[in-house]
Regions:
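A polyampholytic, Gly/Pro-enriched intrinsically disordered region
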Residues: 15-19, 83-86, 180-189
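Short, flexible segments with low predicted structural confidence
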Residues: 52-53, 121-122, 164, 184-185
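Conserved RecA-like helicase motor core of SF1/SF2 enzymes
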Residues: 53-54, 58-153
């Protein structure tokens, strides 16, 4: 029998180390349209800081947690994560011990787990409380043997995935944007913005105003 929960979809992507950040961003944009709650595992403190910082620079609500954090800092980060003010938490295995947040929709093994037990423990953070979850693992070609060991010991059903193209990601983002605009219109709370729209149209080309609106909503 498998050691992993049946409601967790497990997918592996072969990715070079240099391409991992781009791969993660594509999957976040394409797979959850900005609604997922992600726990991303890295091996080292330095990698945790770098990944979280790069995600923030790209506009994601990301935070980090590792062994150098004080208890007060750790509690502050976890509160943000639980409250939904941060939807991507990048952490080391040690820092994530005892983490129990049932709303996590995706676990990402940015760095492949060092052993099968770690794999099972990591991905067990999603698919809780009867919910479905997704476990994503990045492997380099040199780590294929390690992946096979994880599969053999855990009996995990891990499928190989293909990263979405940039065009597919853009399509998903535009679909999400359209939904946001429709929700905004349905709320009928935009009367107060009509004066601002008139002032912008008096100074700018309508196409420029459109681009400003799109950039603001996204």
């Amino acid at each position: 029998d498998t050691l992993t929960a049946p409601k967790i979809s497990q997918i592996v992507y072969e990715v070079r180390n240099a391409d991992k950040l781009d791969a993660l961003c594509r999957l976040i944009d394409f797979g959850s349209e900005g609604t997922g709650i992600y726990l991303v595992f890295c091996h080292t403190k330095r990698e945790v800081d770098e990944v979280s910082q790069h995600l923030r620079l790209r506009g994601y609500e990301s935070d980090a947690m590792h062994g150098d954090y004080t208890q007060a800092q750790r509690e502050a980060v976890l509160k943000k994560f639980r409250d939904g003010r941060c939807d991507i938490l990048v952490a080391t295995d040690v820092a994530a011990r005892g983490l129990d947040i049932s709303s996590i929709s995706h676990v990402v093994n940015y760095s492949i787990p060092q052993n099968p037990e770690s794999y099972v423990h990591r991905i067990g953070r999603t698919g809780r409380a009867g919910r479905e979850g997704v476990a994503i693992t990045f492997v380099t070609p040199r780590e294929d043997r390690q992946l096979r060991l994880i599969q053999s010991v855990s009996k995990a059903q891990i499928k190989r995935g293909k990263l979405p193209s940039r065009e597919e990601v853009l399509g998903a983002r535009l679909t999400g944007l359209e939904e946001k605009i429709n929700e905004f219109i349905d709320d009928k709370h935009f009367d107060k913005f009509l004066g601002l729209a008139d002032r912008l149209l008096a100074k700018l080309d309508p196409k420029d105003v459109e681009m400003i609106v799109v950039g603001t909503v996204t």
